[in-house]
């Protein structure tokens, strides 16, 4: 049907969603010369996929930019379903994402958020409280970056003024996230790969190379520290764990190579930074567009915490309306609207259709979250819908799957969930937020720009005033 380039642009998931009325809940696309693609667009078809065919569609397609420096070979997110994927997922879960480990690193997140709040205040003061506002997302991203950096390396990577490596690493990660999210004609027409028409492979080679180079320097520095007996930590960080790893059987490597450690570390940054900052930016945007919801969540935080106490992670469970705001934001603005693509590992019969091995599978979480069959007034921002609902984002309710479901859902969800709520709550507790003088709630630009996540195309500018 039509022209495949009609689906290009910054929000292909919206255009694909429009086809559901005509073609039904499952869409079959032949993209380019060789890419068979199945798109899932309803909660029922997603339930069938994740409940009954999860293993059959558990591989990942490898796109051209992920070939840079052989990144895909050590990646947990892109690994074929099998022993390496199970091993890498297990080690990251145990060392970063179980509740015990998350609770042990509470102070790291508190310090990173405290620094973010100070930077927000200093930036607002240096602009003279001017009417243009500040791009608060920059500081949220920095906070997320340093939270992850401290859990891996036990140090700030960017806010440390002496860390040139940290700044270079930060810039390399920004580049990798951008190039990974740009549609690449080389993936549609493999015969064009050798020409690198858009220059994406060259850019990814540059930034991935820099990211791996700096990570390897961090690893070498740590090995030297350990040899000299310097900086012994009471709690091991992820880098220590990866260096010390010893396999326990035939399904695990005896030791992790430097390159394997490097890719695991890069992946933790890619997965753990932009998702948090982008989600909090969208949530703050929606509250500024809906002043009554803003007043309601601010009042809840004030009543639970009070004006003179810091917002802490232990407060999150006592703030149901704030949690509802973030769920509603994730329903309307899932970080990865089409999730991470899957691939059929074998010929499969799915809901009456014969799906060939190698077919790419996209799950349109954006369309599912706005489906009127499951949601009343689906295009309205209405956090109250979650106050009496048990629907959650943890992969069991298929009408709300911003982080995926099944075996390959986001492994970092427990930590990401904590980071997102803590960052958001701290910003609301510390400041009152206003729009620049020339911007009204209804005039806020709501367009998305695709990178690794669907972030705001026009970054949110706001004026923070001490609460």
From Swiss-Prot:
Record key words, sorted: Heme, Iron, Metal-binding, Monooxygenase, Oxidoreductase
Residues reported to bind heme: 410
Cofactor(s) listed in the protein's UniProt record: heme
InterPro entries documented for this protein: Cyt_P450 (IPR001128), Cyt_P450_CS (IPR017972), Cyt_P450_E_grp-I (IPR002401), Cyt_P450_sf (IPR036396)
GO MF annotation: an example: monooxygenase activity
CDD domains: CYP76-like
Top-level EC class: oxidoreductase
Pfam families: p450 (PF00067)
Family the entry assigns: Belongs to the cytochrome P450 family.
Name of this chain's protein: Cytochrome P450 76A1
Native species: Solanum melongena (Eggplant)
Gene name of the record: CYP76A1
């Amino acid at each position: 049907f039509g022209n495949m380039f009609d689906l290009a642009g910054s929000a292909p998931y919206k255009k694909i969603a429009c086809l559901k009325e005509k073609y039904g809940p499952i869409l079959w696309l032949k993209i380019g010369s060789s890419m068979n693609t199945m798109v899932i667009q309803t909660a029922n078809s997603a339930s069938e996929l994740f409940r009954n065919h999860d293993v059959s569609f558990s591989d990942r397609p490898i796109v051209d930019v992920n070939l840079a420096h052989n990144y895909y070979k050590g990646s947990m997110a892109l690994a074929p379903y099998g022993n390496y994927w199970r091993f890498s997922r297990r080690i990251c879960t145990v060392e970063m994402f179980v509740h015990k480990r998350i609770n042990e690193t509470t102070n790291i997140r508190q310090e990173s958020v405290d620094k973010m709040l100070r930077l927000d205040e200093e930036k607002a003061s240096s602009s003279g409280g001017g009417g243009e506002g500040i791009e608060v997302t920059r500081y949220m991203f920095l906070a997320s970056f340093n939270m992850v950096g401290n859990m891996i390396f036990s140090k700030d990577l960017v806010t440390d003024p002496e860390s040139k490596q940290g700044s270079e690493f930060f810039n390399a990660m920004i580049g990798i996230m951008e190039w990974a999210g740009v549609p690449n004609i080389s993936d549609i027409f493999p015969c064009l790969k050798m020409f690198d028409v858009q220059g994406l492979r060259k850019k990814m080679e540059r930034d991935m190379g820099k990211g791996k180079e700096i990570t390897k320097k961090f690893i070498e520095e740590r090995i030297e520290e350990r040899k000299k007996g310097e900086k012994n930590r009471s709690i091991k960080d992820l880098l220590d764990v990866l260096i010390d790893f010893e396999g326990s059987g035939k399904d695990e490597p005896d030791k992790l190579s430097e390159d394997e450690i490097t890719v695991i570390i890069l992946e933790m940054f890619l997965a753990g930074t932009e998702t948090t900052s982008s989600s909090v930016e969208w949530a703050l945007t929606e509250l500024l567009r809906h002043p009554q919801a803003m007043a309601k969540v601010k009042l809840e935080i004030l009543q639970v915490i009070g004006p003179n106490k810091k917002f802490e992670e232990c407060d999150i469970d006592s703030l149901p309306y704030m949690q509802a705001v973030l769920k509603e934001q994730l329903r309307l603005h899932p970080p990865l609207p089409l999730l991470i693509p899957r691939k059929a590992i074998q010929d499969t019969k799915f809901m009456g259709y014969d799906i060939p091995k190698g077919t790419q599978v996209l799950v349109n979480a954006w369309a599912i979250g706005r489906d009127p069959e499951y949601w009343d007034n689906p295009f309205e921002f209405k956090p109250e819908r979650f106050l009496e609902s048990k629907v959650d984002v943890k992969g069991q309710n298929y009408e709300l799957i911003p982080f995926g479901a099944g075996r390959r859902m986001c492994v970092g969800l427990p930590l990401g969930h904590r980071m997102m709520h803590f960052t958001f709550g701290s910003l609301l507790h510390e400041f009152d937020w206003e729009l620049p003088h020339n911007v009204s709630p209804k005039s806020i630009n709501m367009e998305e720009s695709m990178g690794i996540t669907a972030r705001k195309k026009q970054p949110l500018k706001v004026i923070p005033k001490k609460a």
